[in-house]
A protein has these predicted regions:
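Membrane-interface junctions at transmembrane-helix termini in multi-pass inner-membrane proteins
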Residues: 6, 64-73, 123-146, 169, ...
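Alpha-helical transmembrane segments of multi-pass membrane transport and lipid-handling proteins
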Residues: 22, 81-106, 112-116, 156-164, ...
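Helix-loop junctions and terminal segments of transmembrane helices
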Residues: 24, 56-73, 135-136, 246, ...
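Membrane-proximal transmembrane or re-entrant/amphipathic helices at the cytosolic face
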Residues: 402-407, 423-486
Length: 486
């Protein structure tokens, strides 16, 4: 794969990720303040089912198809019809399941919400084939641009609906808009009209790897459904709303960086023959992910008490420890999981399935532990997040032979600098008046502190990062004339 194309994509992804992080930092607390824990709790009852079904609808074919030549029309056409059928069948299944779930949860308003969200399952299946084509072509920047565009428009829609008093429907509208715009944008970039053929023998080899991916996602989705049920039963709708919002906000923020970098690693690993080259890219992307996610989540954790008071509102005051522990632990855990892209590119899915099963079981145990109640819950879940990431790196050591210490060294500097920045933000937060304005000042001041600490504590790697960025920018400027006609 062209290093020039890879560098150009990395620059675009970096810019898009920065904008997405800023968007999430502003949007999530604003929606939480406008909607309150109860609306988030109602949405959280529907969300695990939707995410669970989406995992099945994907069928794991997206990652597997990226390894297939685009000239093989029998495979691509058969995959398209298979995915479309799955989307329709599973969407109908979601609508039918909403009735029994509303009775079990004693929430009569749940069926129309889930019926509307069922459309997002079909929209997801329409993005899988073009996504696989773009991955195979190495057009990783398209994912970032499409995702940023969809998130901006969907976020604006959610805010508008929330201000109009739409309640939980603001979150429903955001989800449908997000998946709808992704489907439109990605198909506009890489749609190919499928033939009216279906050959199971042609597509079945992809279901082997896809089946392993689905099994891993199935285990994760089932675990989160049970997890939501346990939290809701123990702490009520408001507690579930706080728990679900914190986990979803942290996940969205971190995945805004980890998804594109994981896609970048997978796209390169699929076509690369040199293992050392893939390993080097993995370490660089681990560094990039750490540089972006660790400071953001650390500062949020440091200012969690100010965030709940000034932005989320008094109804969220009991969620301070959740925010303070879930955000940074999610970022650290995700760093370890980045290596799964390289493992999937080799066609190995079993280890990731077992990892997902272990994570789901541990998270379920964490939320079910009675000792300590609500105050202890964040500590248990944070420990599972960290253990999940570390175990993923250990699996990479066993399967790929990559040293654990190398990945930890790439994240060490950003982690230490993030701790310094978080301490500075906390000190400012303690010594400044209340209100959103001073909260923003405290968070913004952590930025230059982070950069200075990074330079002092990890100078060699930081200078190398700066050199790599300048090289990438130079390649980005050179990309347009090279990509055009001679």
């Amino acid at each position: 794969m062209s290093q020039r194309k890879l560098a150009a994509g990395a620059v675009v992804m970096g810019v898009c990720n920065g904008v997405k992080i800023a968007l999430q930092l502003g949007l999530s607390p604003t929606l939480a303040h406008l909607l309150g824990p109860a609306n988030f709790g109602l949405y959280s009852l529907a969300q695990p089912t939707i995410l669970f079904v989406m995992m099945l609808a994907d069928a794991g074919l997206g990652q597997s198809l990226a390894r297939e030549s685009e000239d093989n029309e029998a495979v691509w056409s058969s995959a398209f019809w298979l995915l479309l059928t799955l989307g329709v069948v599973l969407g109908v299944g979601v609508a039918l399941w909403s009735g029994p779930l509303s009775i079990i949860s004693r929430q009569p308003g749940l069926p129309p919400i889930m019926t509307a969200l069922a459309a997002s399952v079909l929209l997801l299946t329409l993005t899988i084939s073009p996504s696989a084509r773009l991955t195979r072509r190495g057009r990783i920047e398209v994912f970032a641009l499409a995702d940023l565009f969809a998130n901006v428009v969907a976020g604006a829609l959610a805010l508008g609906l929330a201000f109009k008093g739409a309640g939980v429907w603001a979150l429903v509208g955001q989800t449908l808009c997000l998946y709808g715009l992704r489907a439109i944008t990605l198909n506009a970039c890489a749609f190919r009209l499928p033939r009216l053929v279906f050959n199971w023998r042609a597509v079945s080899p992809h279901t082997l790897l896809g089946g392993g991916i689905v099994a891993a996602k199935f285990a994760d989705g089932l675990g989160r459904m049970l997890e939501a049920g346990v939290v809701g039963r123990r702490f009520g709708p408001a507690g579930l709303g706080m728990y679900a919002f914190t986990n979803q906000a942290a996940w969205s923020l971190v995945q805004g960086v980890a998804n594109p970098t994981g896609t970048m690693l997978y796209a390169h690993a699929v076509s690369a023959e040199d293992d050392a080259e893939v390993r080097a890219l993995y370490l660089r992307l681990t560094r990039v992910t750490a540089l972006l996610t660790l400071p953001a989540t650390a500062v949020i954790a440091a200012l969690s008490w100010r965030l709940t008071g000034a932005v989320l509102g008094p109804a969220w005051s009991s969620g301070i420890f959740l925010i303070a522990l879930i955000f940074p632990s999610q970022a650290l855990g995700t760093l370890g999981q980045l290596v799964s892209a390289a493992i999937y590119a080799r066609g190995w899915a079993r280890s990731q399935m077992l990892l997902a099963v272990a994570n789901g079981a541990l998270r379920l145990a964490a939320v079910a532990i009675p000792l300590g109640g609500w105050l202890a819950l964040p500590f248990y879940v944070a420990a599972v997040n960290l253990g999940y990431g570390l175990l993923a790196i250990v699996i990479a050591r066993v399967q790929l032979g990559w040293r654990i210490a190398d990945a930890l060294l790439e994240a060490r500097g950003p982690a230490m600098a993030s701790a310094v920045a978080a301490a500075a933000a906390f000190a400012l937060g303690v010594n400044t008046p209340g209100g959103i304005g001073w909260l923003i000042v405290s968070a913004a001041a952590a930025g230059p502190v982070y950069l200075a600490a990074l330079f002092c504590l990890d100078r060699k790697r930081t200078l190398a990062d700066w050199t790599a960025l300048r090289t990438a920018l130079a390649l980005r400027r050179a990309w347009a004339p090279v990509a055009g006609p001679a």
